Amino acid sequence: MVTLRIFVFFFSVHGALAGFDQYSALVTADPPGSQQVPGTVRVTYLGVNGYQFEANGHALLVDPYFTRAGLTAIAFQRRLEPNETRISFGLRHVRPRVDAVLVTHSHFDHLLDVPEIMKRTNARLIAGATAVNLMMSCGLDRSLVVEPGFTRAIGPWRIRVLPSAHDRIFGWLPFRGTKTHPGTCPAKASDWRLGEPMAFLIEASGKRIYVDSGGTPEVQLPPQVTPVDLAILGVALPDSRRRLRATIERLRPKYVLPSHQDDFFSPVERGFVFGKLTDFPGVMRPFQRHEITSHLILLDYFRPWTIP
């Protein structure tokens, strides 16, 4: 029954809408080939909910996932392996050394590639206990367990961990559960348990960035969190879209970047395509009506953008 439910859900996502063509006015990027200006923060979208942030010669990654396993492998619980060719392609757009990888929760589309990326970039993992135990199960122990309220300075970055939640899919919470100790490296999608969802406030060079993969809870954020320069907010499912306006009102961002809305079964080389369960016209509507005054933007794969 669970497998059937997974298949029905992922089949519905696999059907896709158009790409960015009709929204080209919202797509922002630095001029091609331009170098980052010292003292700025640059953002590169890596696909799904993956991002690279750069400041003062340092890099930070959030939820990097390049393998983009196929629909049938997920739905029928086949063995998942990181695709080293696709990881190599993705890492061509990432600095060779990374200070840390932050993970918002432990599902495969956020964590599967992290062991290989940690090995190649010498990064450490900052994540919840389940994610760290899964990484230790795969032979990686360069990790730091965090929970909401945690703060840490790493290089130019100041990182604050905030509470979050995961969207429900037709009332169902996918692959729920935690992992309290290391064991066997996960083999299939359902082995990558949800764990402890979290959001991050990242500060560097005078800029403040809020990152969540979706499901931002309706809680009052600490006063020192807002306002932010950029809010990256997952909008893959109706749950998070229903809360989007309230989240924006709490965060008071200059820029809003909707995230986790691409077809993550399709390789990035094929270009950005919206997943079928997304509703970008609905996301865009209150901005068009000037009901939300923040600037709505989109980022395309691997095209860096410097936060003004």
Predicted regions and their residues:
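Active-site-proximal loop/helix segments of hydrolase catalytic cores
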Residues: 182-250
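Binuclear metal-ion centers of metallo-dependent hydrolases, dominated by the metallo-beta-lactamase
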Residues: 136-151, 249, 254-308
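Sec-dependent signal peptide recognition
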Residues: 1-9
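Active-site HxH/HxHxD metal-binding segment of metal-dependent hydrolases
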Residues: 71-72, 89-152, 157-174
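Active-site environment of divalent metal-dependent phosphoester hydrolases
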Residues: 49, 69, 106-111, 132-135, ...
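Beta-strand-turn-beta hairpins that frame and shape the catalytic cleft
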Residues: 36-41, 54-60, 151-160, 203-209
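Active-site neighborhood of phospho(di)ester-bond hydrolases with catalytic His/Asp-centered motifs
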Residues: 62-63, 97-107, 126-128, 210-215, ...
